[in-house]
């Protein structure tokens, strides 16, 4: 097993920015995933999961969206820190191309310090 950390360039946190990063751009910052090993990627922002999966992360652990700040039953998170309504990867487990993403709602809040139907969360992941 190999654990990689990826620091997303600041331009990807700007409001109204396109929501895609290529695997090639990720490779410019961190090494290629190791062949024959289970590769875990720590990436703060889950919005770019497709790029992380194409890079080769078997499992990506992420947060940033704070569960969507407030949550609606049957709908999920309402707004992201980038002011995007109904973010796709707000909280929970997702899969793409056979790769997994785990997103926690986290313990803190964003610039608006409130949570509605969105309790603080600490995620414990067991690997075996």
Segments predicted by a language model, with ranges:
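Soluble catalytic domains of enzymes that build or remodel membrane lipids, polysaccharides, and related
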Residues: 1-128
């Amino acid at each position: 097993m190999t654990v990689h950390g990826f620091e997303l360039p600041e331009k990807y946190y700007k409001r109204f920015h396109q929501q895609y990063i290529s695997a090639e751009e990720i490779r410019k910052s961190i090494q290629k995933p190791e062949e024959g090993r289970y590769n875990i990627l720590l990436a703060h922002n889950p919005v770019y999961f497709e790029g992380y999966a194409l890079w080769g992360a078997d499992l990506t652990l992420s947060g940033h969206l704070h569960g969507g700040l407030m949550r609606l039953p049957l709908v999920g998170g309402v707004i992201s820190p980038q002011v995007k309504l109904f973010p796709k990867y707000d909280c929970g487990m997702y899969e793409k191309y056979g790769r997994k993403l785990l997103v926690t709602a986290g313990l803190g809040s964003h610039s608006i310090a409130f949570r509605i139907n969105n309790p603080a969360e600490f995620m414990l992941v067991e690997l075996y």
